[in-house]
Amino acid sequence: MLIEFRFKNYRSFRDEAILSTEAVGLGSLKNCLIPLTSSVKLLPAIAIYGKNGGGKSNVIRAFWLAVQFVRNAQRTQHERAAIPVRQFALNDYSQNEPTEFAFEYTSDGIRYWYGFSATREKVY
């Protein structure tokens, strides 16, 4: 189960953005939460909301790109096609820096962290 997704320097996001499923500050809805540890509970669903042009779609695009990249990494590692990352374009510095993605998740009771950075030419 996904605990957290982080990304940085992607489309309209220059700084790190975090999509977390960790439940904080929920008083009356505790019986709906998924226990991870005795002190950490996860939300069964998340919602992204905000004003028009606020970057909601770019959060979904970042997640989709990172998932597709991981799923197809072995197949695409031999191809010479450009990697479809789009760095933050509103300053010169960010365009030359890699885009970063990271997942924290749990499977069979074990907690994992997986992350990578990429430019259009190279994965780090």
What does each model-identified segment do?
Residues 1-124:
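P-loop NTPase switch/coupling surface
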